[in-house]
């Protein structure tokens, strides 16, 4: 389980230009969210089976709504990738994303590049992700994981999307489904 949560407003004055602008939860600090009605809480509750061991890696959020500086993004991505690498071997991965993060150039797809790097180090294992209603999901994400975005506005169904993501991941691990995802632009 890993999370990277930020909705960037590229017009915002306050930018995320230092590590002091991030909030980090590591390891078991993610687990108290079990009964919280958000993405992570739904996933944790939905994956609660005797044969499942949850491996909480890292969740990162940001203080300001503005652009993520390249060095800050690189550091955050490295922390998540390193935590996933240390947790190997893993059977599957759950990501909690907002899906509208913008980092400085040269990064044009913050969440997608993170998912691609996770796929590179972990191999062909099932991956799912939850997203905010207005996420900008890229081909990198669609090709690498099964997305579960909010269905409602206001966004009151994060918990339900977490439950769905857990159910899907468990079914993929059990071998009962093999989802195929496509991006449809509207």
Give the residues covered by each predicted segment.
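Short, glycine/charge-rich beta-strand/loop segments that flank catalytic centers
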Residues: 59-64, 95-98, 135, 183-186
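Low-complexity, highly charged intrinsically disordered N-terminal segments
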Residues: 44-85
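N-terminal amphipathic/basic leader segments beginning at the initiator methionine
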Residues: 1-49
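Active-site-proximal beta-strand elements of phosphoester/diester hydrolases
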Residues: 2, 57, 149
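Internal, active-site/partner-interface "lid" segment
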Residues: 173-186
